[in-house]
Amino acid sequence: AALVPAVTQASNPCSVMSAIEYGVKHLNVEHIVVMGHSHCGGIHGLMAPESIAGETYIQDWVGIASPALERLQAMTGDEDEKTRSRHCEEGAVLISLDNLLSYPWIAERVKNGQLKLHALYYDLSEGNLYRFSPESEDFELLFHSEKIDVCDR
């Protein structure tokens, strides 16, 4: 799952954050992209916790996205499972962006215009790449490629 822990959730050592810290502080990267995708096994585990019962590391990791699941559960509507999964997958990407901003050294660079954060979502079945637009508060089509045959869950 495309997850980044919040500063309060990161443990030492945290491989995700060590890579991001190195890129930001030593390589002076100007962009961080968090990209989720359809048919995400991590989000499936979050939405169907029985599928990862007893798998402590996986449970803890996908738990980072639990606010996305909580928001999804609070929504009313009769969306099918595929739509619900997509909402949760997209929500997890946005949570990761928020979590990145919980690190002062990232928030400072974003505020100063030295670093930009991007949220992308790739629909494997349709071959569509979406980018989150803060203006519309939605994921908008950025690019279309060939469809990929994947198993529907």
Which residues fall in each region the model found?
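Divalent-metal-activated hydrolytic enzyme cores
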Residues: 2-30, 41-153
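Conserved functional hotspot residues or short segments at active or partner-binding sites
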Residues: 34
